[in-house]
């Protein structure tokens, strides 16, 4: 494990988490960048992790898995080796198309020997327990499930045959543990697919495994991947604890064995306590909740649960692995950067500064928080009468009000830290200079292009000044509600266009979404697991979706549409309104007016360049740490053209 990995885990243990279960590839050949416990050479590094966790009073289990999508290359710079499975099964996740190889009996034995060796390595490194991962389409589930398993030998067919691989593998792990380590099994309560197993089947599976005496605890999950990936990591559209009915239906099969479950989207310690009190499980697991707030447990124990950041289920922690190459969190930029930005790193700045932050979106809010934590005198100006910036826009879309939880947390923290907040005041450069600040953070965000410019066509749209046109801000902040036939031009493929479509269609409008993409949602939304929910909702309301299309221009109650591939055109007539949810452009005039007049001037987040929320909060955090540090760059331009270091 890297230093970043170890620091991330330690921050959670210090924050009160009692047990870490770390997911680890049981095979060396894996395409994922995560610890693998198979080569013996990895034992010393794993021991460092265990020793540090134990020194903080924590316990640590290793979750052994092999997943259909994890197959790595044959060697450096080589094509991928086949994914091993129970049978030939075709998968597709984010364009990663795979057909698993049906393992021979010799290959089954080799895989089981690999799991055994991995368990021995965990034992030698000092792990307290081992869990075999049999959910999410992992190999044990491929044998257990009739959806995957089409074998005709002793590993397929009847339930006892389909259980054989799992029981044999658990038997090997039990021998390795030798009573000195806990052994557990993670399994699905319901695969939620036709042809898969469901709660009654899962009850029988768990009963047989529990009766075998091979495990000390069960971890109950729901859904498989990739078919139900959006259920396996439920986004904001899904209520907290969505797994609970499935776990309740299966848990009695465990008998006296303790049951662990993530329950599907933990939002607070109070919710977890309620689940424990009801008896649905004996241990509550959390992943995203701890990414967002490492001190989740500690704060609750100390009576400070209101200081906890609440995971808003935006799922950028998952999507960022694909787009940023790192696991980033919208409301906790320190996640995976704990060695530099963790809880214990907020030492006083070299020089205490008077810091003015302009803009109350994610970048400005995080900049003000970090500035205050480092001892600066911070004032935040926001032109609107509320905080939130771009987060406010999306939180006003249907079923996304939970995003407000992040804004509420930032506001509470700024008040606790003594930040002066000036709402409803569009501060001028003259006012800023008159205040004689040492540093200014321009976090004034971005707005949707009134000219209809987008990343599909960066040019003015003919007719953009038509009286038919509405901007997203008019609808979400100004209360405009166009009626009749409404055309939405969705040029960015995020939540805004389709969210407004749902909002207006629910109020009776006839809505058509025109998008240059294959679907009206980008890969970023697909990766956050929102797409299935969004498309289902707008289709139920009768919204028409016109993919791979864009418009030439807006006329008198008509728009000219063309296919982005074939250039074929057609005209939509009798249009009552057009919404331009195209591209966003930075609002940063204050940067130009203040340039060269302030000792430190940082333009951050969407004001620097319109991007995702997590990038905005990251930049607010990063450059707030530069304030009052004479050896640091004094603008983002200086920082950009300075050679990178190991720091975030």
Predicted regions located by residue number:
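Glycine/Thr-rich phosphate-binding loops of Rossmann-like dinucleotide-binding domains
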Residues: 30, 140, 193, 228, ...
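Short amphipathic alpha-helical segments
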Residues: 33, 273-274, 297-298, 368-370, ...
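Short FAD-binding loop at a beta-strand-to-alpha-helix junction that anchors the flavin cofactor
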Residues: 488, 593-633
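A Rossmann-like FAD-binding core segment of flavoenzymes
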Residues: 404-449, 458, 463-483, 504-593
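Beta1-alpha1 glycine-rich phosphate/pyrophosphate-binding loop at the start
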Residues: 218, 355-420, 490-529, 533, ...
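A charged, well-structured terminal subsegment
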Residues: 325, 628-645
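Short, contiguous acidic/charged loop-to-helix segments that flank catalytic cores in large enzymes
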Residues: 233-239, 344-347, 352-353, 393-405, ...
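Flavin-dependent oxidoreductase catalytic cores
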Residues: 1-358, 362, 366-378, 386, ...
